[in-house]
Amino acid sequence: PCVTSDYLPTILGLLEAKPVSDRPIDGMSLVPLLDGNLAKRGQPIGFESKGQLAWIGDRYKLYRKGGAAEFKLFDLVADPSEKNDLAKAKPRLAKRLAGELAAWRASCQASAAGKDY
């Protein structure tokens, strides 16, 4: 999967150009994918919309519906239909992914407040 934050690093990669500043760039270049050299993304993608949160990696997806107190955890390789919630069976993994999601959200909030610029 890819997201809009992958556009800039991909365009820079296609043009073999460097960023014009030291500001952090979200996303990743998809040039290796286009060249056939990338089978897995390797870094999770975060989503937040209308109270819903998701942290989606190559294998696991952590998800919380708006208003829900608990996250659900799915193994996208073994359970692509997302029918088996593994959050209780794998609490350490769920906690680690929730921490990564929280760090991503904090980074987004810092960017929105102009702290990266």
Predicted feature descriptions by range:
Residues 3-76, 107-114:
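C-terminal cap/loop subdomain of S1 sulfatases and analogous C-terminal strand-loop tails that border
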Residues 10, 82-85:
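A general alpha-helix detector
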Residues 13, 36, 89, 99-103:
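Residues within well-ordered alpha-helical secondary structure of globular protein domains
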Residues 55, 94-97:
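Hydrophobic packing residues in well-ordered alpha-helices of helical domains and bundles
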Residues 79:
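Intrinsically disordered, low-complexity polar regions and short flexible loop motifs
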Residues 84-92:
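Active-site-proximal N-terminal segment of extracellular/periplasmic enzymes that hydrolyze or transfer
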Residues 96-117:
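Charge-dense polyanion-binding interfaces
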